[in-house]
């Protein structure tokens, strides 16, 4: 499963200004 990948992508997008 690529759950960690999605979490990382979401975290990055949320951290973006």
Swiss-Prot record:
Its BP terms in the Gene Ontology are: sporulation resulting in formation of a cellular spore
Keywords recorded for this protein, A-Z = Sporulation
This chain belongs to the protein called: Stage V sporulation protein AA
In which organism is this protein found? Bacillus licheniformis
């Amino acid at each position: 499963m690529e759950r960690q990948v999605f979490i990382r992508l979401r975290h990055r997008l949320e951290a973006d200004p």
